[in-house]
């Protein structure tokens, strides 16, 4: 608080895949809860992604021999196979406790077009065919791990798909001939498709989803002093319709990180399920931030005359300060003053239902600037105030604003005799409200980021204040390129 200072399923699935076991026995300072609505959205987005990937499948040519009593022996070949259309309809994404996620797709269809050749002795015939694949079901488990950089890894396991209905339509001069052994041909086409679908899913997870997960932040900078640690503290807690993902959420000094000795209290999350995702942020995160700021001297402030508005009725020199303490003018004629404000201890954020507030305790020491440029202390004052905090969440970060009550001032020590505390209190409140707090609010407006992967945006935000933690509900949108 310085015055005149400064500092394939790429979607909500990205959040789900943060659920990797890490340090055991540590309470998180941030929890992300994904509801059944969020899982449903992730499955829907994943379905669109897989559907696009299906069009990229390259189907191999295949051939075989046939023998028909009335015709004799011959060879056939199917080539230039291309997927013309595909419809992936029903899908579900469910937690797989202790392992990861389970994706199921049902009631889907694929249309394939290609060409055929038949050869018997010196006779060669050719034509085209259409293949309608119906009642396709796909299931795959997504197993989660973690790499040395503390980012999640994902591998596809147990992929299976079944085609229950397949119809081959052959055109050409001897289409009737191929229809005589269509069961054999359909069986081969079915095996090719089933193999290629799982191969496509494996490739999509390896080439698309895994690199996407590398965009998830492990740490993020808040300002020139603070950073936040988004590493994970435990395995996901899978329930009937939700999945809780637990982050360390630890605020630290970017220039000198030290271990946090105060344990984070347990957060009892409400059973809300109206929105896709909920963020629970412990008051511990905010209190560590104020402690780091305090240790770095960032909460201290200095007031000099050149920092006051030009039209201010009060100047920081001994002549103008005579109404506060008459003796100062006689003892230190025509000298400038400097006020140094220090916060006695790191203020704690009071988080209770409907209330966010701070009660910082400060001391202000007045110095006379001597002709030698040395400073001489002439008075010390104690200052207490209540500051209410409002937080705002946008689609990627948390921002704040302070709303202070009037500061109360008491005299601790005066080396210049009588001191008009009430007059100084009025001056201090004017300065705090018009200079100091606006500067602080400008810094708070920069906010700190939420742990979101690329192209994820939040909307329909719902902010709640509970005992010892803040709770933000939101719906999610994946922003396609």
Swiss-Prot record:
* Main location, first listed in the record: secreted
Q: Which GO terms describe its molecular function?
A: coreceptor activity; lipopeptide binding; lipopolysaccharide binding; lipoteichoic acid binding; signaling receptor binding
Coiled-coil annotation reads: none
Does Transport appear among the keywords?
A: yes
Q: What are the cysteine partners in each disulfide bond?
A: 159-198
| Signal peptide, first to last residue | 1-25
List locations, semicolon-separated: Secreted; Cytoplasmic granule membrane
Xref: PROSITE patterns: LBP_BPI_CETP
The alphabetized UniProt keywords are:
Antibiotic, Antimicrobial, Disulfide bond, Glycoprotein, Immunity, Innate immunity, Lipid transport, Membrane, Secreted, Signal, Transport
One example of a Gene Ontology biological process annotation: positive regulation of macrophage activation
One Gene Ontology cellular component term attached to this UniProt record is:
cell surface
Q: Name the InterPro entries on file.
A: Bactericidal_perm-incr_a/b_dom, BPI/LBP, BPI/LBP/Plunc, Lipid-bd_serum_glycop_C, Lipid-bd_serum_glycop_CS, Lipid-bd_serum_glycop_N
Record CDD domains: BPI1, BPI2
What are the glycosylated positions?
Answer: 300, 355
Q: In which tissues is it expressed?
A: Detected in lung, liver, heart and kidney.
Q: What is its quaternary makeup?
A: When bound to LPS, interacts (via C-terminus) with soluble and membrane-bound CD14.
UniProt record similarity statement = Belongs to the BPI/LBP/Plunc superfamily. BPI/LBP family.
Its biological purpose: Plays a role in the innate immune response. Binds to the lipid A moiety of bacterial lipopolysaccharides (LPS), a glycolipid present in the outer membrane of all Gram-negative bacteria. Acts as an affinity enhancer for CD14, facilitating its association with LPS. Promotes the release of cytokines in response to bacterial lipopolysaccharide.
Q: What is this protein called?
A: Lipopolysaccharide-binding protein
Biological source species: Rattus norvegicus
Q: Name the gene.
A: Lbp
């Amino acid at each position: 608080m310085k015055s005149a200072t400064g500092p394939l399923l790429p979607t909500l699935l990205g959040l789900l895949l943060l659920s990797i076991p890490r340090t055991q026995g540590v309470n998180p300072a941030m929890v992300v809860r994904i509801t059944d609505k969020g899982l449903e959205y992730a499955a829907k987005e994943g379905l669109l992604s897989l559907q696009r990937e299906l069009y990229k499948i390259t189907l191999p040519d295949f051939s075989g021999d046939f023998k028909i009593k009335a015709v004799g022996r011959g060879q056939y070949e199917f080539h230039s196979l291309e997927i013309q259309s595909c419809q992936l309809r029903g899908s579900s994404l469910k937690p797989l406790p202790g392992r990861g996620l389970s994706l199921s797709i049902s009631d889907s269809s694929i249309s394939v077009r290609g060409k055929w050749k038949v050869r018997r002795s010196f006779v060669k015939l050719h034509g085209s065919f259409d293949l309608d694949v119906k009642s396709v079901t796909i299931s795959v488990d997504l197993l989660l791990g973690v790499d040395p950089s503390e980012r999640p890894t994902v591998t596809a396991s147990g992929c299976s798909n079944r085609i229950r209905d397949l119809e081959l339509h052959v055109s050409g001069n001897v289409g009737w001939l191929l229809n005589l052994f269509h069961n054999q041909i359909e069986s081969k086409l079915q095996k090719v498709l089933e193999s290629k679908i799982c191969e496509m899913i494996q490739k999509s997870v390896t080439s698309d989803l895994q690199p996407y997960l590398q965009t998830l932040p492990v740490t993020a900078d808040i300002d020139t002093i603070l950073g936040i640690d988004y590493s994970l503290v435990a395995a996901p807690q899978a329930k009937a319709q939700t999945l809780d993902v637990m982050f360390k959420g630890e605020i630290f000094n970017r220039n000198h990180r030290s271990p946090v000795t105060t344990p984070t209290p347990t957060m009892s999350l409400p059973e809300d399920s109206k929105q896709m995702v909920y963020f629970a942020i412990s008051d511990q995160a905010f209190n560590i931030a104020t402690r780091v700021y305090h240790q770095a001297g960032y909460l201290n402030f200095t007031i000099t005359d050149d920092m006051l508005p030009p039209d201010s009725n009060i100047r920081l020199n001994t002549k103008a300060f005579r109404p506060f303490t008459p003796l100062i003018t006689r003892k230190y004629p025509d000298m400038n003053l400097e006020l140094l404000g220090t916060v006695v201890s790191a203020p704690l954020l009071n988080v209770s239902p409907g209330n966010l507030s701070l009660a910082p305790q400060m001391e202000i020491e007045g110095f006379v600037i001597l002709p030698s440029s040395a400073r001489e202390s002439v008075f010390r004052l104690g200052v207490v105030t209540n500051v209410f905090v409002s937080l705002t969440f946008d689609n990627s970060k948390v921002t704040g604003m302070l709303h202070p009550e009037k500061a109360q001032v008491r005299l601790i020590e005066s080396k210049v005799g009588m001191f008009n505390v009430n007059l100084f209190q009025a001056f201090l409140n004017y300065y705090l409200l018009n200079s100091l707090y606006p500067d602080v609010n400008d810094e708070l407006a920069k906010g700190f980021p939420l742990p979101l992967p690329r192209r994820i945006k939040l909307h329909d935000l719902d902010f709640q204040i509970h005992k010892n933690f803040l709770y933000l509900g939101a719906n999610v949108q994946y922003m396609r390129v």
